[in-house]
């Protein structure tokens, strides 16, 4: 329910019960349950701050709660402005308890620029990771040269109706892997791609390309290209996020339990419309677990979906051994080329993991594909060249499919790169097409654009 700020201040808060929940924006930025007497004097000012994001200032006197400020910063449209706002928060934050929450938002903001190394550095600054044990490891090397993941998955796909694959929301390599699977799986009968956090399902299926209005994670180029490629092949994209707000929260053990339940229910309602086709479900982290979500949460989307549909999904896990979180996974570089591999069950020394998912993926990918020479007939070399002018604050360059961009200025770039000096001179290898190059400043304003040659 949309509540006018005047009504909220004058009527709902003074007359409300001790505890209530209020919502901000056209979609939920945060839910907060608190004592109405505390909010009475502060809420109106806070809502005014929500309406003036362009003037966002960390620790604004009207946004006293740190998490609210961080959420607001992360949700600002664009790429450079939200990242810079979060970095400002980080520079003034002295509270250890806030750091973990803030870093999660920073990881996502950096992921939009596909900066895995920066994310890893932030991770290592904050945590000491202890990776899962892998048997038969010699000098911390994993010998998986003959264990290529894609052929294994395609073989398993023949005998399953539903495949669930997870990702880290910070890792473009997981989205690229999913994209590599799409064409072959489509030929095996998989017709639907269900994506976490997807919005505007009807619009994107009709438009046939993604925009930044279609979800939060889809702003990242590889996630956008996953959706774009699926639509081009012939998949129908399905949204399944829980949008029930907190109307019936009392029925569930926790917010996690509620979200897992409704995600699964939304998937099942779609699935039962076409049980003859096969389905791909793409989700983050623990949603695809078959045993439990975490040490303290037993419910998962995969478990609920199985209960509703009586279908046992084939669960593929990319996060348990992801090198962003796990420092114990290393490859024998003399035997393994850049590729995606899977672990045999006798290589996993963790009985819980064996129950959580059916297959564990590790990747030996280090370079963004577009930045590597490619002699394929369908690929062409393009040149990105831009010299910063004096006193110019050029921040990053975007490359758009020209047709998409001029149909909708909210189209998502196929490639994005931050400036690291005064000159950006880079060759990229992209599918043959017409592209538009745009350079933006620190305020996400366009300062230069041209066709990409």
What positions do the PLM features span?
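Compositional signal for N-terminal targeting/processing segments
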Residues: 3-453
């Amino acid at each position: 329910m949309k509540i006018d700020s005047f009504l909220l201040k004058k009527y709902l808060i003074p007359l409300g019960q001790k505890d209530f929940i209020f919502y901000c924006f056209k979609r939920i930025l945060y839910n907060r349950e608190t004592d109405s007497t505390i909010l009475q004097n502060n809420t109106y000012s806070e809502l005014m701050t929500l309406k003036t994001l362009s003037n966002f200032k960390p620790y604004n006197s009207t946004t006293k709660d740190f998490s609210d400020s961080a959420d607001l910063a992360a949700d600002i449209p664009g790429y450079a402005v939200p990242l810079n706002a979060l970095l400002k928060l980080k520079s003034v934050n002295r509270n250890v308890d806030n750091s973990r929450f803030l870093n999660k938002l920073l990881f996502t903001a950096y992921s939009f620029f596909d900066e895995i190394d920066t994310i890893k550095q932030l991770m290592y600054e904050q945590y000491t990771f202890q990776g899962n044990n892998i048997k038969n490891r010699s000098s911390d090397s994993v010998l998986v040269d003959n264990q290529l993941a894609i052929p294994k998955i395609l073989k398993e796909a023949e005998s399953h109706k539903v495949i669930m694959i997870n990702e880290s929301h910070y890792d473009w390599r997981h989205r690229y892997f999913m994209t590599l699977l799409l064409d072959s799986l489509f030929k095996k009968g998989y017709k639907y791609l269900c994506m976490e956090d997807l919005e505007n399902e009807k619009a994107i299926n009709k438009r046939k390309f993604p925009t930044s209005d279609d979800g939060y994670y889809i702003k990242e180029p590889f996630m956008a290209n996953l959706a774009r490629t699926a639509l081009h092949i012939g998949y129908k994209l399905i949204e399944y996020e829980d949008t029930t707000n907190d109307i019936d929260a009392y029925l569930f053990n926790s917010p996690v339990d509620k979200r897992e339940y409704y995600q699964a229910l939304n998937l099942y309602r779609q699935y039962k419309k076409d049980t003859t086709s096969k389905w791909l479900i793409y989700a983050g982290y623990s949603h695809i677990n078959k045993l439990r979500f975490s040490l303290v949460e037993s419910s998962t989307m995969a478990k609920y979906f199985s209960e509703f549909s009586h279908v046992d999904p084939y669960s593929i896990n990319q996060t348990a051994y992801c090198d962003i979180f796990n420092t114990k996974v290393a490859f024998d570089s003399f035997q393994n080329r850049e590729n995606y591999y899977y672990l045999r069950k006798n290589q996993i020394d963790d009985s819980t993991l064996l129950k959580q998912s059916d297959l564990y993926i590790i990747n030996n990918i280090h370079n963004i594909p577009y930045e590597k020479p490619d002699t394929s007939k369908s690929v062409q070399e393009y040149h990105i060249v831009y010299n910063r002018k004096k006193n110019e604050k050029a921040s990053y360059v975007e490359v758009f499919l020209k047709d998409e961009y001029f149909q909708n200025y909210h189209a998502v770039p196929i490639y994005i790169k931050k400036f690291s000096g005064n000159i950006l001179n880079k060759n990229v290898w992209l599918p043959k097409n017409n592209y538009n190059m745009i350079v933006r400043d620190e305020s996400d304003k366009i300062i230069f654009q041209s066709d990409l040659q």
